[in-house]
């Protein structure tokens, strides 16, 4: 499954439509955390982060960890400066009103797997 398919299957709102998505690159891993040092230590490159954190550091961590996308759950939406930085870094941002637990469960059903700490 690629990012486009993931977004469609989960009904996610794409906050960064101007970021080009490589539809040939599969997304295999997910990570859920609001502790960004934990994300840096354990999230796998090319994976997807599910979080309620919406500040600028989330994009910096996603870029440093080479994540494919960030999903903001529980109705959280970042400010425009965060969205602009994600576009600059080439990070896809999604948003959903679904709680993080439900998002992670759906990603697991779709075949994504987590990272062992």
Stretches with model-predicted labels:
Residues 22, 31-48, 52-117:
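Feature captures the catalytic cores and cofactor-binding loops of soluble hydro-lyases/lyases
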Residues 25:
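Glycine/Thr-rich beta-alpha phosphate-binding loop at enzyme active sites
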Residues 1-20:
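N-terminal, charge-rich interaction modules
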